[in-house]
Amino acid sequence: MNATQTVGADWELDFYSRPILEADGRKRWELLVTATPAADATEIPFRFSKCCPSGEVNSLWLTAAIGEARQCALEAGWPAPRRLRCWRSSMRTMVQRAATELDLEMIASRRTYALLEWLQQREQEVYPQEEGFMAGPLAPPPAPVATPPVPLPEEVQGDAWSWASLPADLLRDASDWPSSFSGLLPLPAGLDSDQPVPGLRLFSNSRALAMAGWLGGLEPVKLLVDGRQLVLEAGQDDRWLVSDLDSAAAEAIAGDLSQSKELGKGLQFIAIQASPEEQAFAGFWMMRDIATL
């Protein structure tokens, strides 16, 4: 493998029960870890899975298992992780304890697209083949975020914004674009090259770079239209109000996002630039609205 095909050695982690009953009648617990792939990755990133005895579901077991995963990665030529992203709020405290013991940064974030796709694949192809499999959903997904959106922090509010779209094929070269901050993703398999990818452009003549730094820290997950508001979901459960919309704009943007979810694998983007005419980006993030989120 090529160790350069991970982004900053970030890992995405899920430690939770699976729809499989063990011999003792208890649900199987499993740790899944995957490295976050770079936008131009051409192979499956580092992955690690380990079952946990139901009586040992605690931070001590998790710490040891993540340490084992780190050793496996190093032995296989992958870089050790610096950060762990945890997407389940119910497991946040336990993962934080394990990360602290291992001197790793833990980020509570749903920017775990590679992990969620792997989880979906295991739900469809792996778990049903296991003895003790319980038909039904993999595990209850996190409850839909219901908190009212709050205005974006002042540090991320620009002078203006616009709604835009880019052909999917253009995003293949996104890693070559001049950008001070970015969060790029591999293009999903089976995506048509001319599929429009909708997104938000934010502009600020004087503060574009600072805005980009702040937005990256928010861990942007996906854009959606809620009533007549454009909302950015971020982190583990944050909802940020980007802008109020008139009825025509709300309908048009919601339609673009719906089409992307149906035909474009849920791909979206956010760009921050000094002006609409500027070619370079202060920041550029790709996001996905996928079913598990």
Model-found features: residue ranges?
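Secondary-structure boundary/capping micro-motif
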Residues: M1-L293
